[in-house]
Amino acid sequence: MTDNTRLRIAMQKSGRLSDDSRELLARCGIKINLHTQRLIAMAENMPIDILRVRDDDIPGLVMDGVVDLGIIGENVLEEELLNRRAQGEDPRYFTLRRLDFGGCRLSLATPVDEAWDGPLSLNGKRIATSYPHLLKRYLDQKGISFKSCLLNGSVEVAPRAGLADAICDLVSTGATLEANGLREVEVIYRSKACLIQRDGEMEESKQQLIDKLLTRIQGVIQARESKYIMMHAPTERLDEVIALLPGAERPTILPLAGDQQRVAMHMVSSETLFWETMEKLKALGASSILVLPIEKMME
C-alpha cells in the first residue's frame, strides 16, 4: 500500500502517452526507477508515487479520489465523463493544464470506394468505435440516427469483417486507415494529453508539491517551445531584428570589441519558423546566428 501523505499520480503503463509522460516527469526533476512489471513506483527524491495503469482507468481513479493527479488523453477523459453522466453520476475533477504531447484526433472513416456526402451519409448505418459516447454526442447534434458497434481494439478492421459500415477511431497519420481500405472523412474531436486533479480537500503539503510540479511543467513546456538565440546585429537595424523574434523578454545587447557598427544580441524566442526567420535576419545584416535548444526555463 502507498503512504497517504505521498502525492499519487496515475499515468499510462504502456501505449501512446507512456513514454512522453515519463519524459515529462523526468524533465521536472522527478527521479523514478520504473520497472516493466511494477505497477507502483516511488520517486527517489520527492514524496511522489506513480501508479502505472491502463489509460481508460485513469479518469475514474482521479474522479473517485483514488489518486491525486492523472496524466491522460482528453479523448479518454471526455469519454469517461460522458459515460458517468449517462449513468446519472456527477463526476468531479479539475483540469490543471493541457500538455504539449499526445496530439490526435477522433475521426469518422468510411471505405474508400463509398461515396461521402457529409455526416448524413451515416444515417441508419452501423459504426464501430471505442468511443460510443463521443460518437453519440456528435451525431445527436447532427440529428443522425445510427447503430453503435462497440470494439475495444482493431476498430479499423470492422468494415472489411462485415461488422460495421464505418468506424470512429483515433487517427494520427492516417496510415492505418489507408492500409485497411478506409479514408478519414470527418474529425469529431481533437485531443492532447492533459493533467487532471481530484476534487476535494487536499493536504497542504500535497498542494504545495502540486504547485511546484505545475511550475516545473510550465518551464519544461516553455523551454520546448522556445529557442535561445545569439547573433551579431547591425546597430541601426536593431528594432527590425527584434520585431522578427517574439521573445519572453527584451533581448540582452552587448558591445563587440572594436566594432561600433554591430552589437551582440542574446534572447529567448518562441519563434518556430526558423529557416525563414534566419534568412530574414541575414537580409537585415545579422551574422553569426546561433539557435540553441533550451533544457529548462523559469520566468
Swiss-Prot record:
CDD domains tied to this protein: PBP2_HisGL2 (cd13592)
This protein's name: ATP phosphoribosyltransferase
EC number: 2.4.2.17
Coiled coil: none
Its job: Catalyzes the condensation of ATP and 5-phosphoribose 1-diphosphate to form N'-(5'-phosphoribosyl)-ATP (PR-ATP). Has a crucial role in the pathway because the rate of histidine biosynthesis seems to be controlled primarily by regulation of HisG enzymatic activity.
Keyword Protein biosynthesis in annotation: no
InterPro entries, alphabetized: ATP-PRT_HisG_long, ATP_PRibTrfase_cat, ATP_PRibTrfase_CS, ATP_PRibTrfase_HisG, HisG_C, N-reg_PII-like_a/b, N-reg_PII/ATP_PRibTrfase_C
Reactions the enzyme catalyzes: 1-(5-phospho-beta-D-ribosyl)-ATP + diphosphate = 5-phospho-alpha-D-ribose 1-diphosphate + ATP
Organism this protein belongs to: Escherichia coli (strain K12)
Highest taxon above the source species: Bacteria
Name of the encoding gene: hisG
Compartment(s) of residence: Cytoplasm
